[in-house]
């Protein structure tokens, strides 16, 4: 078997194995060393390829594809520093447990560590962030090479689904010439293989006594596409309030036991005595709720469908590695407890807080008012993707009367890659992106995917000319002299030119009334810039906090 035949057999087999374990989309960043796989993916009849010249943005775009399709997605790049640009998205995928398949092309072994161009040490280069990594052998025509691909793909497949989900990395060295025989498409298969299946039942004997206490809470974070119907059923039967993070997707159910205003209530001084807490899913966004969890004496139970339990903000008394539905189904035989008054107390606080927030939004002109207006425009067909820092916090506080789905990059919580991830989701969903100006600037090149692929997306860009969240931190008061340069970081950019560069329509709003009457587009790529003031935003938010503290004090 000559080199061309060996290369052809190897890359066609590898692509077929990826398909067999569920990969249907690949994001390719063009380069020479990745030629063999790029050509094969393009030739595969049942794998869709996306082309993005920027590796960092491409990797985040793939995360959006994963969120939108609920399937593993692969990324492919050439050798050298191109691969290093994947790191931020891989870190996000690891913490968010997204099945990202990282494929880095490499120089052959004889060109490593000898000063050859475009060659860095790529073996295990993402070891801190991936669940699996393997440096594949070079194509040599040996049957052992194909066996190795099959064995390692089977091992890696356990990380594409189920509780061990997360990123995997294959490093693939290729020797020149790099072109496989594309006439051998008969080697490409579209056969699916049996995927790992996880099914668990548990004993709840250890928490039976705790569950008989009256003052219980269920706190639900990002559920990452898990079914949640049993949480609502259990809450209804046992009269337990559910403090639901916007990423839990529970708020859109409009269930009477779902509490949405808890962040503002705890910020206002809420301090009800709680006997136990069942924490489900990822940690919540709310800093105030996390601070309360850290200091409370309540017995804490964590339920996560993953082998790596996220204990933040404080280790629990007991944890269960099981799906939320299976866990709450296991509790259904426990005796009923009288909790009507406990639940009604939370529902009363929620109702009063919503009234106060709604009244606030009628008169406010700050960023929260724009966010509130945007939420009212969304329907159950819409997906709201939210940037980090202030946008996600405003959504956390104001999302209580919408059927839209809500997503964000809340693994590593970075401001990078937000535009790209939202556009990846836009390939599968009707997406509106809410983002701040610094986060938008950080990932403007991600807009290229909308231009190249005619993706539909609405971008609401909140421009306060800097980092608005820092105004809420101690630096604002303790480092006044240096605050604006080090933390405010104004850029003074005119984003209308960005819209022009990437073929987005653009409209700027400097008053809330005009924005309220604006309609989100149903097709095409559109940017809506709203101009806000950081100091005014801080002042109006503080007024809302004061109003809610009065409610809490009167109620308690």
Curated annotation (Swiss-Prot):
EC numbers, comma separated: 2.2.1.9
Entry cofactors: Mg(2+); Mn(2+); thiamine diphosphate
GO biological process assignments: menaquinone biosynthetic process
Gene Ontology molecular function terms on file: 2-succinyl-5-enolpyruvyl-6-hydroxy-3-cyclohexene-1-carboxylic-acid synthase activity; magnesium ion binding; manganese ion binding; thiamine pyrophosphate binding
Pathway info: Quinol/quinone metabolism; 1,4-dihydroxy-2-naphthoate biosynthesis; 1,4-dihydroxy-2-naphthoate from chorismate: step 2/7; Quinol/quinone metabolism; menaquinone biosynthesis
Keywords, sorted A to Z: Magnesium, Manganese, Menaquinone biosynthesis, Metal-binding, Thiamine pyrophosphate, Transferase
SS bonds (residue pairs): none
Cofactor note: Binds 1 thiamine pyrophosphate per subunit.
Catalysis performed (reactions): isochorismate + 2-oxoglutarate + H(+) = 5-enolpyruvoyl-6-hydroxy-2-succinyl-cyclohex-3-ene-1-carboxylate + CO2
Cited function: Catalyzes the thiamine diphosphate-dependent decarboxylation of 2-oxoglutarate and the subsequent addition of the resulting succinic semialdehyde-thiamine pyrophosphate anion to isochorismate to yield 2-succinyl-5-enolpyruvyl-6-hydroxy-3-cyclohexene-1-carboxylate (SEPHCHC).
Assembly behavior: Homodimer.
Family: Belongs to the TPP enzyme family. MenD subfamily.
Stored HAMAP family: MenD (MF_01659)
Protein name (Swiss-Prot/TrEMBL): 2-succinyl-5-enolpyruvyl-6-hydroxy-3-cyclohexene-1-carboxylate synthase
Organism (species): Staphylococcus epidermidis (strain ATCC 35984 / DSM 28319 / BCRC 17069 / CCUG 31568 / BM 3577 / RP62A)
Gene: menD
């Amino acid at each position: 078997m000559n080199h061309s035949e060996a290369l052809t057999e190897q890359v066609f087999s590898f692509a077929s194995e990826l398909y067999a374990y569920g990969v249907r989309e690949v994001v390719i960043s063009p380069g020479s060393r990745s030629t063999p796989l790029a050509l094969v993916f393009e030739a595969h009849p049942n794998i869709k390829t996306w082309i993005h010249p920027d590796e960092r943005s491409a990797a985040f775009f793939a995360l959006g594809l994963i969120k939108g399709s609920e399937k593993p997605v692969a990324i492919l790049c050439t050798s050298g520093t191109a691969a290093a640009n994947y790191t931020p998205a891989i870190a996000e995928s690891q913490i968010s447990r997204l099945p990202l398949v990282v494929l880095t092309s490499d120089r052959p072994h004889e060109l490593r560590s000898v000063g050859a161009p475009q060659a860095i040490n790529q073996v295990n280069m993402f070891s801190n962030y991936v669940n699996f990594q393997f440096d594949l052998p070079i194509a040599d025509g040996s049957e052992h090479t194909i066996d190795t691909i099959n064995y390692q793909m089977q091992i890696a497949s356990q990380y594409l689904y189920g509780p061990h989900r997360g990123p995997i990395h294959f490093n693939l060295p290729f020797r020149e010439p790099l072109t496989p025989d594309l006439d051998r498409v008969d080697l490409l298969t579209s056969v699916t293989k049996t995927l790992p299946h996880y099914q668990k039942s548990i004993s709840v004997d250890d928490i039976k006594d705790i569950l008989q206490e009256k003052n219980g809470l269920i706190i639900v974070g990002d559920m990452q596409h898990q079914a949640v119907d049993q949480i609502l059923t259990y809450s209804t039967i046992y009269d337990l309030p559910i403090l639901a993070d916007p990423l839990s997707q529970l708020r859109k159910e409009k269930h009477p036991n779902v509490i949405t205003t808890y962040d503002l209530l705890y910020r206002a001084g809420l301090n009800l005595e709680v006997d136990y807490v069942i924490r489900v899913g990822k940690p919540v966004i709310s800093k105030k709720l996390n601070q309360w969890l850290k200091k409370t004496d309540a017995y804490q139970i964590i339920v996560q469908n993953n082998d790596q339990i996220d204990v933040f903000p404080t280790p629990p008394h007991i944890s269960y590695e099981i799906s939320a539905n299976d866990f709450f189904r296991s509790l259904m035989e426990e005796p009923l407890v009288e909790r009507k008054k406990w639940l009604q107390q939370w529902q009363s606080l929620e109702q009063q807080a919503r009234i106060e927030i709604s009244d606030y939004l009628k008169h406010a002109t700050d960023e929260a008012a724009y966010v509130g207006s945007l939420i009212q425009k969304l329907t159950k067909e819409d997906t709201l993707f939210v940037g980090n820092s202030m946008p996600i916090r405003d959504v956390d506080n104001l999302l209580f009367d919408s059927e839209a789905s809500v997503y964000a990059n809340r693994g590593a919580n970075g401001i990078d890659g937000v535009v790209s991830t939202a556009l990846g989701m836009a390939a599968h969903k009707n997406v509106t992106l809410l983002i701040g100006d610094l986060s938008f600037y950080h990932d403007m090149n991600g807009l290229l995917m909308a231009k190249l692929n005619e993706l539909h997306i609405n971008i609401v860009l909140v421009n306060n000319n800097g980092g608005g969240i820092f105004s809420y931190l101690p630096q604002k008061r303790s480092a006044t002299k240096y605050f604006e340069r080090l933390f405010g970081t104004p850029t003074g950019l005119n984003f209308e030119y960005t819209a022009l560069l990437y073929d987005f329509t653009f409209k700027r709003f400097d008053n809330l009334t005009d924005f309220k009457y604006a309609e989100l587009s149903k097709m095409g790529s559109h940017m809506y810039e709203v101009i806000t003031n950081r100091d005014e935003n801080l002042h109006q938010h503080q007024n809302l906090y004061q109003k809610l503290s009065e409610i809490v004090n009167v109620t308690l």
